[in-house]
């Protein structure tokens, strides 16, 4: 067999001993914690032993070294055995394992990146393989390095569609540096898994998706060593037949034990039984990696030149996004773009044309696209920008919230926002996206209103930690800013003001331009308004909003192409709550819209220039 050298009996026994030590540690940790998933750990003990102490190449004292092989524990509830591995490797003190799930410990119930050996948070099932695909794509096509990527999945999560999106992606892009290990332990959380131990069906499914699929006895270290040696030339799925709770007498392969630690007396007895099978306490040292990953610096990536727009010219911010991203791509070869088969609408096709080797077509699989981006961003190897219609990011909200838990630095651009897209109708209109992205921890939400602001938003997003969302629009609107205008996160702009302003009007994107048009008509009636462009909806420029409100008799009017819930109006209301003498009035979309021309829809839903002018007059009259 090509490249496979069977380990000698001493090495095989050492791997068996390692697997049993991992079992013992998992049982001890979960019993001490009074919670956790020891049976899910025990089914994977031999897999983890062979992976980390025979197959993988890594520096055990430097888990995030860029040359290391990568590992993703997609079945994140088996975290105790991952922690046990790193204690076995000498990175964690063994005593720390007994602090599992304690508030004072970094060993959370599921893997999180405050642990140096965890690249992506897992635990919401079905997402690990997508992240692993992103790592493998980066290794093969961007780093062109020899590190390999391994992902351990449970059989229960194979019901998740996102797993099969990732399987398809790996096959399309020939990720021969990727190995998925399927821990087929038969039992789910509350019932047996749908296929139980029908290994041939698992194999046929993987093969149908273009993978090399190998069935093994998941408790045979020899079969596992052999299978990992065969993982070449195409993405490989090692389909391991295992038993949940392996090695735990009276519990192995029994239902109703998921997520239950062993009682102390029972744990002590089982640990003695397992310990008696260990022949040597000698530990296997990790094999170091081949050091061929390039040095990468993604800090302080700046546009090569200022924007080149002319005030008054018209451009849609979605197109300005594509132009800006392509331009930023010339500043760093680590800027990458991903799209969900909408590149001719989001205009990421401009990036593809100028940087074809750094564009990843993810097709219509938005959940996987976000996971791919998360994987690409790990260990600061790339700066990913994903784009699709903003409405379609709602499908990937779980992946986005897990990206935040992963402390991932990814940028998402959502186009076709609001009723202003027109005739395509409500299924295409993003009207919930601001609420969604504002709720994500440590997120930054950009809402640029012209081409200059959009270009600045792209540059800022590339250098901002966390999840960045850029909301772009379909209609063409006028350039209102000079090319040398300075933009910063959390810094709003006063677009129009006078000493006689009576109301502060806050709009963004399309509605900012409607507010400016309303100001023109109101001026003819000798009514002046102050118009603010927030630029970022999160964080919001509270100081400028308050200063403007106080200069306009405490009156604020927000207008947005978004539902009332969670958008600009609620963000502004939260910012000024408790401030005396300030009132906030909202104009927003109040029901599910319909098809129509953009101007007709803006008018129908009361967010056009006429509605703004009428609301301003109402506020003044009310006083």
From Swiss-Prot:
The modification Phosphothreonine is found at residue 287. Mg(2+) binds at residues 155, 185, 187. One of its GO terms (molecular function) is thiamine pyrophosphate binding. Substrate binds at residues 37, 258, 318, 345, 416, 424, 474. It is an enzyme of class 2 (transferase). Binds 1 Mg(2+) ion per subunit. Can also utilize other divalent metal cations, such as Ca(2+), Mn(2+) and Co(2+). SUPFAM superfamilies: Thiamin diphosphate-binding fold (THDP-binding) (SSF52518), TK C-terminal domain-like (SSF52922). Keywords: Acetylation, Calcium, Isopeptide bond, Magnesium, Metal-binding, Phosphoprotein, Thiamine pyrophosphate, Transferase, Ubl conjugation. This is Transketolase. It comes from Macaca fascicularis (Crab-eating macaque). The gene is TKT.
């Amino acid at each position: 067999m090509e490249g496979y050298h069977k380990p000698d009996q001493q090495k095989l026994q050492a791997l068996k001993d390692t697997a049993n030590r991992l079992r013992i540690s998992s049982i001890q940790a979960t019993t001490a914690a009074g919670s956790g998933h020891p049976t899910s750990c025990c089914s994977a003990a031999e897999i983890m032993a062979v992976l980390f102490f025979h197959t993988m190449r890594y520096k055990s004292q430097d888990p995030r070294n860029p040359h290391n092989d990568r590992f993703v524990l997609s079945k994140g509830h088996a975290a105790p055995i991952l922690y046990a591995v790193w204690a076995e490797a000498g990175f964690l003190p063994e005593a720390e394992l007994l602090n599992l799930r304690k508030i004072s410990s970094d060993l959370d119930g599921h893997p999180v990146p405050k642990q140096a050996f965890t690249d992506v948070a897992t635990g919401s099932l079905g997402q690990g393989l997508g992240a692993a695909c992103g790592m493998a794509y980066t290794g093969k096509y961007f780093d062109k390095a020899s590190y390999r990527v391994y992902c351990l999945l449970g059989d229960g999560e194979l019901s998740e569609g996102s797993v099969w999106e990732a399987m398809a992606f790996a096959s399309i892009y020939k990720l021969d540096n990727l190995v998925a290990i399927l821990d087929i332990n038969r039992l789910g959380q509350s019932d047996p898994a749908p296929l139980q131990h029908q290994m041939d069906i698992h194999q046929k499914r993987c093969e149908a998706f273009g993978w090399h699929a190998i069935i093994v006895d998941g408790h045979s270290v020899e079969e596992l060593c052999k299978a990992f040696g065969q993982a070449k030339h195409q993405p490989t799925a090692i389909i391991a037949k295992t038993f949940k709770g392996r090695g735990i007498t009276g519990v192995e392969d029994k239902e109703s034990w998921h997520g239950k630690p062993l009682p102390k007396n029972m744990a002590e007895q089982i640990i003695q039984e397992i310990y008696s099978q260990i022949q040597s306490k000698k530990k296997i040292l990790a094999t170091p990696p081949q050091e061929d990953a390039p040095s990468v610096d993604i800090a302080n990536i700046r546009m090569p030149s200022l924007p080149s727009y002319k005030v008054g010219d018209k451009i849609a911010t979605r197109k300005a996004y594509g132009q800006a991203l392509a331009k930023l791509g010339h500043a760093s070869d680590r800027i990458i773009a991903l799209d969900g088969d909408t590149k001719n609408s989001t205009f990421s096709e401009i990036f593809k044309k100028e940087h074809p080797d750094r564009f990843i077509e993810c097709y219509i699989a938005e959940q996987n696209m976000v996971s791919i981006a998360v994987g690409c961003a790990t260990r600061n190897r790339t700066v990913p920008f994903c784009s699709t219609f903003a409405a379609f990011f709602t499908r990937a909200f779980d992946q986005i919230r897990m990206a935040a838990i992963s402390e991932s630095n990814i940028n998402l651009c959502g186009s076709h926002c609001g009723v202003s897209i027109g005739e395509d109708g409500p299924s295409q209109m993003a009207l919930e996206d601001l609420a969604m992205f504002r709720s994500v921890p440590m997120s930054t939400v950009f809402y640029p209103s012209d081409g200059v602001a959009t270009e600045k938003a792209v540059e800022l997003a590339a250098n901002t930690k966390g999840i960045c969302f850029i909301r772009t629009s379909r209609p063409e609107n006028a350039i209102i800013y000079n090319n040398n205008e300075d933009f910063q996160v959390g810094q709003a702009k006063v677009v129009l003001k006078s000493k006689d302003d009576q109301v502060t009007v806050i709009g963004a994107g399309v509605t900012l331009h409607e507010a400016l048009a309303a100001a023109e008509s109101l001026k003819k009636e000798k009514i002046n308004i102050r118009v603010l462009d927030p630029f970022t909806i999160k964080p919001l420029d509270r100081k400028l909003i308050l200063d403007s409100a106080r200069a306009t008799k405490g009156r604020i009017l927000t207008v947005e192409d978004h539902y009332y819930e969670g958008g600009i109006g609620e963000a502004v209301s939260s910012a000024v709550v408790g401030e005396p003498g300030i009132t906030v009035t909202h104009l927003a979309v109040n029901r599910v819209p319909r098809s129509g021309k953009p101007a007709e829809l803006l008018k129908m839903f009361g967010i056009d220039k006429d509605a703004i002018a009428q609301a301003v007059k109402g506020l003044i009259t009310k006083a």
